[in-house]
């Protein structure tokens, strides 16, 4: 046996064997006793020729989920390595004499001096439709007790984002089912829209309602309308993930969803890896001409996990002790969301990253980084949430930079001025509390603003189709709710939608099929609204 620079070469001694006999024999014939030594010699020589070199190293130090290894001189960045205890790790720091490796398991099972061997595989995960309806960990292993995942296709978690030429501009709407978002902050397929806010302001609720809203299209046979969803839970409680899975099952939405869970009890490397794994699973749909949605909930916990790993690997810290490449961490992840051109399959991958702020501070390091990478943000405020305005969207700070090109034309017709009007209303309302003597115009702005705010409220788990949203917003914008008391606006909505389904089915059908509020459809809608208000 030879050993040099961490390389182990196994040699099988060939001794005591007689020279081979060059006698041709058919495979069907029985071997003669004199031929047995030559057959054995050939097989032993063949086994020696097929013997491979196995590169191994030894653990120098272990602690805090980080192992320093010597001997793996040819290991690749982000390659999987396997410890003799069965634990797997990923090589991150490639130094002159040692390799810094993060562990995907309990570091108490690893000992100093333990043998580590290369796998010659960069970290990858299973992909494909077989994962739909399953809950997996950051390495793609099932954790839902439903047995192994039957797929042979695998994909690297770290892949280069599509270039400029394969992409096309965002042009198809991605409906969330929430009136406030679909009207004022529209999202298109292939867009990156950030959901940002303090804890307990309804960030996950928006993402979950978006997944539930697509049941109406995923139950149809039209593949171009379907949206396959990947929900990545990073650093969340296991009970929260279990509730989310249960809610998806109750609403028959788990069948087109994949849950990637790296909960708070998982190690930092798994929390760092989970968003990349979820992205790789979503990319499979994008690259096969389908449409995918990935929710990263949330990226601030991924950044904290990456900071922990980097500091333990002794990488130099920067602002807020994050490493210098934390911007690149998120940009390389979010750039993989794209709308592909028809020449490249026409698929899309939409990203909804979530960032948790501290005390509403959007000027912190990670929030500003992700705001600059994404195509817009939905900003949620604790103050609005506790006032009962849910979803608690701050209209002034929320924006969609590319989604307006993908917005349904009927929605654009009725909701074109609603964002500006609500921003003016909030400004006037802040001054109105100091003075009681208001002119008629200001009073009208306040009254209509109150009703529009009430109209845009929406309970959780009740997404609306666009053909139901358009008539409701039309009522608010055109002043049909001005005579209705503010506390009866919600009652109006609950009664108007069923009435519209029965008496205005052709109006809803026209909006759904044409996507435009034509003159004829608008006249019919006015008649239905007036008829309903006469008996309300």
Curated annotation (Swiss-Prot):
Binding site for ATP: 197-204
Gene3D superfamilies: 2.40.30.20, ATP synthase alpha/beta chain, C-terminal domain, P-loop containing nucleotide triphosphate hydrolases
Cross-referenced InterPro entries: ATP_synth_asu-like_sf, ATP_synth_asu_C, ATP_synth_asu_C_sf, ATP_synth_F1_a_nt-bd_dom, ATP_synth_F1_asu, ATPase_a/bsu_AS, ATPase_F1/V1/A1_a/bsu_N, ATPase_F1/V1/A1_a/bsu_N_sf
Any one GO cellular component localisation term in the record: matrix side of mitochondrial inner membrane
A GO biological process held by the record: proton motive force-driven ATP synthesis
Gene Ontology molecular-function annotations: ADP binding; ATP binding; proton-transporting ATP synthase activity, rotational mechanism
Principal location listed in the UniProt entry: mitochondrion
Keyword list, A-Z: ATP synthesis, ATP-binding, CF(1), Hydrogen ion transport, Ion transport, Membrane, Mitochondrion, Mitochondrion inner membrane, Nucleotide-binding, Transit peptide, Transport
Subcellular localization, as worded in the UniProt entry: Mitochondrion; Mitochondrion inner membrane
UniProt key word DNA damage: no
UniProt-annotated site: Required for activity, residues: 398
Transit sequence range: 1-27
Quaternary structure note: F-type ATPases have 2 components, CF(1) - the catalytic core - and CF(0) - the membrane proton channel. CF(1) has five subunits: alpha(3), beta(3), gamma(1), delta(1), epsilon(1). CF(0) has three main subunits: a, b and c.
NCBIfam families documented for this protein: atpA, PRK13343.1
Protein family: Belongs to the ATPase alpha/beta chains family.
Purpose of the protein: Mitochondrial membrane ATP synthase (F(1)F(0) ATP synthase or Complex V) produces ATP from ADP in the presence of a proton gradient across the membrane which is generated by electron transport complexes of the respiratory chain. F-type ATPases consist of two structural domains, F(1) - containing the extramembraneous catalytic core, and F(0) - containing the membrane proton channel, linked together by a central stalk and a peripheral stalk. During catalysis, ATP synthesis in the catalytic domain of F(1) is coupled via a rotary mechanism of the central stalk subunits to proton translocation.
Full protein name: ATP synthase subunit alpha, mitochondrial
